[in-house]
Amino acid sequence: PTITNDGVSIAKEIELEDPYEKIGAELVKEVAKKTDDVAGDGTTTATVLAQALVKEGLRNVAAGANPLGLKRGIEKAVEKVTETLLKSAKEVETKEQIAATAGISAGDQSIGDLIAEAMDKVGNEGVITVEESNTFGLQLELTEGMRFDKG
């Protein structure tokens, strides 16, 4: 069995019989996938926010709210929240900041430290590949130039 707290991994596993529930589940899967594609993290938060928007949206429509007006209101709120987040965002620049951020995202500070070290070695334009291994532990391997695994 796989143990995960990653929203996109969990969302992919949801299969429902009821056609209306299935539409909702597909919507949440799409939210999680798009979030993962764009940000690489935050899928659980995006999934919870999507569920809250759907729940409250349906409640408001059932109470007589205009669905198009509700949609416009949500879009305005999204613009305002995005603007506020961008204003309060801070660039992650130092190796220590990268290690702290990556450690929180990975849920393991030793992984965060290794990611910061890898980023320090390859720079902002470099490529970092994470692979599973049959051995225990973490290791960093630097390949300069290009590498072709097959072919």
Curated annotation (Swiss-Prot):
Assigned keywords, A-Z: ATP-binding, Chaperone, Cytoplasm, Isomerase, Nucleotide-binding, Stress response
Localization per record: Cytoplasm
Highest taxon, organism lineage: Bacteria
A single MF term (Gene Ontology): ATP binding
EC number(s) given by UniProt: 5.6.1.7
Main location: cytoplasm
Gene Ontology biological-process annotations: protein refolding
InterPro entries: Chaperone_TCP-1, Cpn60/GroEL, Cpn60/GroEL/TCP-1, GROEL-like_equatorial_sf, TCP-1-like_intermed_sf
Transmembrane region(s): none
Family annotation (Gene3D superfamilies): GroEL-like equatorial domain (1.10.560.10), TCP-1-like chaperonin intermediate domain (3.30.260.10)
Binding site for ATP: D41, G42, T43, T44, T45
Annotated catalysed reactions: ATP + H2O + a folded polypeptide = ADP + phosphate + an unfolded polypeptide
GO cellular component annotations of the record: cytoplasm
UniProt function note: Together with its co-chaperonin GroES, plays an essential role in assisting protein folding. The GroEL-GroES system forms a nano-cage that allows encapsulation of the non-native substrate proteins and provides a physical environment optimized to promote and accelerate protein folding.
Subunit structure: Forms a cylinder of 14 subunits composed of two heptameric rings stacked back-to-back. Interacts with the co-chaperonin GroES.
Stated family: Belongs to the chaperonin (HSP60) family.
Protein name: Chaperonin GroEL
Record lineage: Bacteria, Bacillati, Actinomycetota, Actinomycetes, Mycobacteriales
